[in-house]
């Protein structure tokens, strides 16, 4: 029985959405992972000329250069026009998300907080009733104090686990030098409460809770097509 790749459908939907709202890419902020690469390839297929893109990670910078984009230095730009990224989980009602599966949550959080328009693209399998249902909540922590930060997180009952990778020994370290720790929280009743709690833990640099940052979430469907969730921040198509 035939069907469609939800991520390809979501990438097409994001470009359609930009066309409907009259969004100019301008300086583009780009998340990390295969999802945003599909968006960029779809843009190229539609004849969108590569411009300046500010990456959230070194991995993204390499991909952008390979696709002909001018890679903007995040140390120079004060903000971006449009930010495009995927998500590990998305709560449709409020547009809340968990991100950081690729370990780039710090760069992704900064870029999305300094963007005029944020569009997140996901497959329908990423939708959840409550954040934490399917994936852990990642945090980036200071590398020199990992054990102490872990102790603080354990005392809060957050079930932390230092992320490891089969490609290397030791913990996963972000491009910004922080250690990635996954919190096995289970479904969250109060994501904002957890965000506030984590920000009061010394040594936590950033969290993978993306709350109040989405303008639109484009959901790709395996049955073909997509649906647009939002606007979440007062915009309208």
From Swiss-Prot:
The keyword ATP-binding is assigned to this record: no
Catalytic activity: aldehydo-D-ribose 5-phosphate = D-ribulose 5-phosphate
Residues that hold substrate according to the record: 32-35, 85-88, 99-102, 126
GO MF terms, alphabetically ordered: ribose-5-phosphate isomerase activity
Catalytic residues in the record: 108 (proton acceptor)
Broadest EC class assigned to this enzyme: isomerase
One GO term describing the cellular component: cytosol
A Pfam family reported for this protein in Swiss-Prot or TrEMBL: Rib_5-P_isom_A
EC number: 5.3.1.6
BP-aspect Gene Ontology terms: D-ribose metabolic process; pentose-phosphate shunt, non-oxidative branch
Keywords: Isomerase
Keyword Magnesium: no
UniProt record similarity statement: Belongs to the ribose 5-phosphate isomerase family.
Quaternary structure note: Homodimer.
Task performed by this protein: Catalyzes the reversible conversion of ribose-5-phosphate to ribulose 5-phosphate.
Name of the protein this chain belongs to: Ribose-5-phosphate isomerase A
Organism, as annotated: Aeropyrum pernix (strain ATCC 700893 / DSM 11879 / JCM 9820 / NBRC 100138 / K1)
Source lineage: Archaea, Thermoproteota, Thermoprotei, Desulfurococcales, Desulfurococcaceae
Gene name as annotated: rpiA
């Amino acid at each position: 029985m035939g069907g469609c790749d939800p991520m390809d459908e979501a990438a097409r939907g994001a470009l359609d959405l930009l066309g409907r709202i009259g969004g100019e890419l301008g300086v583009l902020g780009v998340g990390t992972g295969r999802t945003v690469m599909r968006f960029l390839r779809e843009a190229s297929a539609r004849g969108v000329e590569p411009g300046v893109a500010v990456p959230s990670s070194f991995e993204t910078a390499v991909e952008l250069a390979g696709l002909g984009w001018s890679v903007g230095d995040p140390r120079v730009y004060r903000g971006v026009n449009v930010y495009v990224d995927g998500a590990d989980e998305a709560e449709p009602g409020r547009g809340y998300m968990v991100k950081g599966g690729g370990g780039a949550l710090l760069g992704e959080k900064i870029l999305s907080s300094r963007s005029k328009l944020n569009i997140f693209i996901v497959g329908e399998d990423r939708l959840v009733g409550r954040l934490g249902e399917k994936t852990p909540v990642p945090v980036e922590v200071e590398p020199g104090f990992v054990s102490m930060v872990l102790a603080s997180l354990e005392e809060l009952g957050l079930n932390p686990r230092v992320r490891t990778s089969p490609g290397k020994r030791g913990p996963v370290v972000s491009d910004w030098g922080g250690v990635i720790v996954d919190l096995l929280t289970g479904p969250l009743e109060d994501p904002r409460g957890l965000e506030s709690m984590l920000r009061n833990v010394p040594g936590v640099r950033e969290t993978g809770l993306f709350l109040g940052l989405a303008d639109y979430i484009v959901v790709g469907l395996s049955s073909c097509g997509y649906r647009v969730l939002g606007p979440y921040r007062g915009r309208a198509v």
